[in-house]
Amino acid sequence: MKPRLSVLTIGVDDLEKSLRFYRDGLGLATIGSVGTEFEHGAVVFIDLQAGVKLALYPRRSLAHDAGIAAQPSGATEFSIGHNVSSKPEADAVMEQAKAALRQALGTLRPE
């Protein structure tokens, strides 16, 4: 079997804020939340590239599906890389991400 990544799922505490961050702040394509009619079913799929999606799934629902108890969230649970070719490009990506966080959360701690 040749491994192939098709869906990368991230457990989130607030699905709507996460949707706003990725869609409105970072400009990633999505149709929004689906499966909201089902208990533990709401999810957001974001198109990353051909055949690869990012799924935002409430942490409690993800734990429910896995048959485990939900754990407290932490900043070191997961990271996603975004490769760039220069420091100015990295700075621009970071500024866009910070602006998206401010828009989604309303505040951002100073550095």
Q: Where are the regions that the model predicts?
A:
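Core segments of cupin and vicinal oxygen chelate
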Residues: 11-54, 59-61
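Residue-level signal for secondary-structure boundary sites
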Residues: 54, 64, 88-90
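Vicinal oxygen chelate
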Residues: 13-16, 77-111
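Residue-level detection of beta-strand scaffold positions
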Residues: 7, 43-45, 90
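A short, local hydrophobic-aromatic micro-motif
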Residues: 6, 29-31, 105-106
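N-terminal beta-strand motif that seeds the catalytic metal site of vicinal oxygen chelate
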Residues: 1-19, 37, 77-82
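Short glycine/proline- and charge-enriched loop/turn segments
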Residues: 71-75
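Short beta-strand/turn micro-motifs at beta-sheet edges
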Residues: 65-70
